[in-house]
A protein has these predicted regions:
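Active-site metal-binding motif and surrounding structural segment of the metallo-beta-lactamase
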Residues: 1-9
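Short, glycine/charged-enriched secondary-structure capping and boundary segments
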Residues: 2, 21-24, 87, 105-107, ...
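Generic beta-sheet signal
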Residues: 8-10, 92-93
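Short histidine/acidic/glycine/proline-rich micro-motifs that form metal-
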Residues: 12-16, 147
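Metallo-beta-lactamase
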Residues: 15-71, 77-149
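Accessory terminal helices/loops
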Residues: 25-29, 130-139, 147-167
Length: 167
């Protein structure tokens, strides 16, 4: 379908992309076989020659745009965030929590940490949040869901939620 496409992935995840049996087993243990089949269908291995391991501070050029991959454990040990060097926007994956506009109240964005059952590490997550903020991002783009910009306030909310979950 995309014969020239490459997969950019954290080094800890690369082997699971080439041989996904442990990944499939882990996802199935958390969500169940029926859900995995419905949501993901058949999970196929990626040929090793199409995998790019993005170690911490790897820069990827995408059509002339420089993207900086940052190692950000906490949600999972194999997590990267991507900084668009042109805009200083950060694509956070699941690292900077989830935020749905439908849950906003009184003009404030709702944010809550994503805590995977198997790899959540609150101390690593706190350190990764601080690291992301040290880049002084213009915005963060959450996988779940969309753009957020009140980053100092939302990071305080996120850190408070992490503390509440781990007490």
């Amino acid at each position: 379908k995309f014969p020239n496409a490459k997969l950019v992935v954290h080094p800890r995840g690369a082997r699971h992309m080439a041989e996904p049996s442990k990944l499939i087993a882990g996802v199935t243990a958390v969500y169940g076989a029926e859900y995995v089949a419905k949501m993901y269908g058949e999970i196929l291995p990626i040929p090793a020659e199409r995998i790019i391991e993005a170690a911490d501070e790897t820069t990827i050029s995408l059509n002339g745009r420089e993207l900086l991959c940052i190692d950000t454990p906490g949600h999972a040990r194999h997590h990267n965030c991507i900084i668009d060097q042109q805009t200083q926007g950060i694509f956070t994956g699941d690292m900077f929590g989830l935020s749905y506009r439908e849950l906003d109240t009184d003009g404030r964005a709702f944010i809550f940490p994503t805590t995977t059952p198997t790899q959540f590490d609150p101390d690593e997550m706190r350190a990764s949040i601080a690291r992301l903020l040290s880049y002084q991002p213009s915005a963060m783009y959450l996988t779940h869901f969309g753009q957020i910009t009140d980053l100092v306030k939302l990071s305080e909310d996120l850190l408070r939620h992490i503390s509440a979950l781990t007490q």
